[in-house]
């Protein structure tokens, strides 16, 4: 899910997010999950994302703690919902113009396959894909290590803010999915011969995130 409630360029939760999730908190839901919280500020989806602070400097936990509290704010007498933060790296689906990078800078992805490049579409559709999405820059091992660290840092932020857990966004198109996908995995990772090998990075992110 994507709320489109942040400023252009993304940022922490604001009063619009608090109002939305406070309303949902009174709905007697068992679990409430945030929209995708981007672990990389240079890989946004539609430009107004929730974005984690940098791993490499001081940060303000208050906006995230306020969001967690809002998600737990059930009506009197009701059991509070569990609050999960959904962590995401948009990868190759981060668009040219509102993706958090200069329009000429390509996003990082496990392979150089551009969004829409393997579809049998009309000429106009192919041109639209070309206009909206760059051919990605293939991730190095260092880039992969950074992505793992970013997910783990997100888990740390979630725990510190008072969330009950995290959800790792693994749907089609996003980095977490592509890292273990046979057709879009990084070329430096040997061809998987078993389910365990295909999911080695997924498992690494999961284990390291759980450790946080």
Region spans (language model):
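Short connector loops/turns at beta-strand edges and beta->alpha or beta->beta junctions
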Residues: 1-4, 37-44, 172-173, 180-185, ...
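N-terminal capping/small domains of soluble enzymes
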Residues: 1-90, 97-99, 136, 147, ...
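Active-site oxyanion-binding pockets that recognize sulfate/phosphate
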Residues: 14, 54, 134-144, 148, ...
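Alpha-helix-loop-beta-strand connector modules within alpha/beta enzyme cores
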Residues: 49-81, 179-212
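General structural feature for long, well-ordered alpha-helical segments within catalytic domains
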Residues: 63, 67, 140-143, 147-150, ...
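Non-globular sequence segments
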Residues: 72, 80-82, 88-157, 161
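Short acidic, glycine/serine/threonine-rich loops at helix termini
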Residues: 94-100, 177-181, 199
């Amino acid at each position: 899910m994507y709320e489109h409630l942040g400023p252009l360029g993304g940022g922490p939760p604001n009063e619009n997010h608090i109002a939305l999730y406070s309303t949902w908190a009174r709905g007697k839901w068992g679990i409430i999950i945030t929209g995708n919280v981007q672990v990389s500020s240079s890989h946004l989806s539609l430009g107004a994302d929730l974005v984690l602070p940098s791993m490499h400097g001081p940060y303000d936990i208050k906006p995230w703690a306020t969001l967690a509290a809002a998600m737990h704010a059930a009506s009197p007498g009701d059991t509070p919902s569990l609050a999960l933060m959904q962590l995401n790296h948009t990868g190759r689906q981060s668009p040219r113009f509102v993706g958090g990078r200069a329009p000429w800078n390509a996003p990082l992805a496990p392979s150089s396959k551009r969004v829409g490049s393997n579809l049998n579409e009309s000429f106009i559709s192919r041109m639209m894909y070309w206009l909206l999405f760059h051919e990605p820059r293939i991730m190095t091992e260092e880039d992969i290590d950074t992505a793992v660290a970013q997910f783990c840092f997100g888990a740390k932020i979630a725990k510190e803010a008072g969330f009950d857990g995290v959800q790792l966004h693994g749907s089609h198109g996003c980095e977490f999915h592509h890292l273990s996908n046979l057709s879009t995995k990084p070329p430096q990772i040997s061809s998987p011969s078993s389910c365990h090998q295909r999911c080695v990075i997924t498992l690494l992110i999961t284990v390291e995130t759980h450790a946080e």
